[in-house]
């Protein structure tokens, strides 16, 4: 579901990720970025620092605006905002473990007003990285 929705993004993909080790999701994001879709993300600093198969470096090397969060605690969001109209969120980390072993959930919200609220939170979290 996530990759299918990302593959159909036309204008923008914003994401906040605690754990991001999914090659499939990373490849979908990179593909859309190559096609001109705006892509920006914030990932949890502790997870990036542990670098256990994470996608941070891969995305950064693909010239995607990906940053480490700047808060003292965990940046525990698991959110995609697609075309400022669709939100994907839930317990699901963007990880191989979530795909293959864990019981996880996501909810997909098709509502521009709700997407705008998530976008405000993304912008707040992103501003703390600077």
Segment roles from a protein language model:
Residues 14-18, 79, 118:
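Short, structured motif recognition centered on aromatic/hydrophobic residues
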Residues 19-23, 45-49, 72-75, 86-87, ...:
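Solvent-exposed loop/turn segments at secondary-structure junctions
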Residues 2-5, 28, 54, 80-81, ...:
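Surface-exposed beta-strand edges and their flanking turn/coil or helix-capping segments
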Residues 5-6, 59, 74, 119, ...:
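Generic detector of leucine side chains in alpha-helical contexts
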Residues 2-65:
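Primarily the HKD phosphodiesterase
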Residues 60-62, 67-71, 76-78, 82-85, ...:
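A post-motif C-terminal structural segment
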Residues 86-130:
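Signature of lipid phosphatidyltransferase scaffolds
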């Amino acid at each position: 579901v996530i990759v299918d929705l990302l593959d159909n993004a036309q204008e923008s993909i914003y994401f906040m990720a605690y754990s991001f080790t999914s090659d499939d999701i990373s490849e979908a994001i990179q593909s859309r970025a190559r096609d001109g879709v705006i892509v920006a993300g914030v990932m949890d600093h502790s997870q990036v620092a542990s670098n256990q198969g994470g996608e941070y470096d891969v995305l950064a090397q693909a010239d995607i605006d990906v940053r480490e969060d700047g808060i003292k605690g965990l940046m525990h969001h698991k959110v995609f905002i697609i075309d400022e109209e669709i939100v994907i969120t839930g317990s699901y980390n963007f990880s191989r473990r979530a795909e293959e072993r864990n019981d996880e959930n996501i909810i997909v919200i098709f509502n521009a007003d709700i997407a705008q609220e998530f976008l405000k939170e993304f912008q707040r979290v992103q501003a703390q990285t600077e």
